Amino acid sequence: MKNTMKLSALLFTSAFLLGACGQEKKEETTIATTQATTTTATPTTVYSLEDAQKAVFEAASNSGTDTMTLYYKDDVLLKEEKVSTFIISKLAGDNPLEMLKKAAGETKEKLKVFIGKGVEYNTDYKDDVFTITNSYDYTKLDMQKLKEVYPNLNLRDDKTLSYSEFKEGLLNRGYKEKQ
């Protein structure tokens, strides 16, 4: 049962840890008595992956590992890449492979509107190892829509996620930063 709980926690960690970096451009319209004027709000900082810093975190158990690579600039999380591997023969339960496939399918279904628009989600099974590979490019995602799917996202006022808060959450969940 403990392994099942760990498995579930590992599988859904990325879904609950999603952050944001999408920027919204807002337009305002001012109407004069005889003339309409359109103005644009002051642009916010747009982040790019080109000059991002990188940090790698890992969590391991006897039944698998999670490796998460984070890209960030200043205190803004820009992208998350995660590879979760599960050794099927070391998992508890009657049919852990089917359980993993079902859970992964449910997660992929929940994310389907974002796939190809900032989210990639893939699974593979080979030689007793089930692998889930996913990435979230927060510079491309519509973060407001993502917040609708995951209401617990801790978005800041500028629609970004704090890298330092994200990192702290990983460390609190048992991840170790790789040097």
Regions found by a protein language model. Name each.
Residues 1-19:
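Sec-dependent bacterial lipoprotein signal peptides
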Residues 14-17, 38-40, 179:
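Sequence termini and other peripheral, non-core segments
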Residues 26-49:
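Low-complexity, Pro/Thr/Ser/Glu-rich flexible segments characteristic
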Residues 5, 19-20, 124, 136:
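Intrinsic disorder/low-complexity detector
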Residues 41-179:
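Subset-of-secretome marker
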Residues 6, 19-32:
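Bacterial lipoprotein signal-peptidase II cleavage site
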